[in-house]
Regions:
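Conserved helicase RecA-like core
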Residues: 1-300
Length: 300
């Protein structure tokens, strides 16, 4: 996706990138954004919309990393559940690139705490996921509020009708780039499945954890309730487990992720949506406690 998207984005045209998670698309839009941003201009110049807080934080970290030898570039992740006054202060202090969830970006636009006059690039990352989560109106509000003379770039794993409607309304002759599923990046992963009665799942998971002793593992569940139930069950069995889902406050989520990254928590139990964008190197095992409702979730 990078080889195809970077030249197209740098040329300034509107773009639709159909690519799954794990294809390196953050750099595909991050590098062109950094090429186009003027470090001397201490005004907002690019906005990236992401479906979740975790993904916004991760994308911001990656773009910061890409810009570490460029002086004067400020990247700010903004999302709900975080102190808005701090965000306003950071926006006033010359942030050029905002990575945010649609709701919070819209909130700043309504409060007039985000000045959009110099915005030349808007990226929708995981656009289908944002629509699934009910962000369509927020996205349309944001796109309607930025200058018309801009580049609009959209990345999505799937292309349902609502995405095509947004494309038609807000993009001009967008170039379509596809990275097909055959090229999906999951090398060197061994997969196994066990046919287990629901009430035996907890016992089987515990046995597998004992046999293989993965350093860090992620367990995916389909519901928040199941996450809470399983975390309590694992803690009761003496495992170092913690849960992650959308009902948790941002501080709690940050604390859980910090514990997992440092290895204090060995088992992260999460819903698919909350876990989107999690990037931890040392994960040795992934358990799909429930079968994901979407094959894209299964791969990511």
């Amino acid at each position: 996706i990078q080889a195809k998207a970077i030249p197209a984005m740098i040329s300034g045209i509107d773009l639709i990138g159909q690519a799954q998670t794990g294809t390196g698309k953050t750099a595909a839009f991050g590098i062109p954004i950094l090429e186009k941003v003027d470090p001397k201009l201490k005004k907002l110049q690019a906005i990236v919309l992401c479906p979740t807080r975790e993904l916004a934080i991760q994308v911001a970290d990656e773009i910061r990393n890409l810009s570490r030898y460029m002086h004067g570039i400020k990247v700010l992740p903004i999302y709900g559940g975080q102190d808005i006054v701090k965000q306003i202060r950071s926006l006033k202090s010359g942030t050029q690139i905002v990575i945010g969830t649609p709701g919070r970006v819209m909130d700043h636009m309504r409060r007039k705490t985000m000045k959009l006059d110099f915005v030349h690039t808007v990226v929708l990352d995981e656009a289908d996921e944002m629509l699934n989560m009910g962000f369509r109106e927020d996205i349309e509000f944001v796109l309607s509020g930025v200058p018309e003379e801009r580049q609009t770039v959209l990345f999505s794993a799937t292309m349902p009708k609502p995405i095509m409607e947004i494309t038609k309304k807000f993009q001009n002759n967008a170039k379509v780039i596809k990275v097909t599923k055959k090229e999906l990046t999951v090398p060197n992963i061994e997969q196994y499945y066990y046919d287990v009665k629901p009430k035996k799942k907890e016992e089987v998971l515990s046995r597998l954890l004992d046999i293989y002793s993965p350093r860090l593992s992620v367990v995916f569940c389909n519901t928040k309730k199941q996450v809470d139930l399983l975390v309590n069950a694992l803690l009761g069995r003496g495992y170092f487990a913690a849960g992650l889902h959308g009902d948790m406050k941002q501080e709690q989520r940050d604390r859980v992720m910090q514990g997992f990254r440092t290895g204090k928590t060995e088992i992260l139990v999460a819903t698919d949506v909350a876990a989107r964008g999690i990037d931890v190197d040392e994960v040795e095992a992934v358990f799909n406690y429930d079968l994901p409702q979407d094959d894209e979730y299964y791969v990511h």
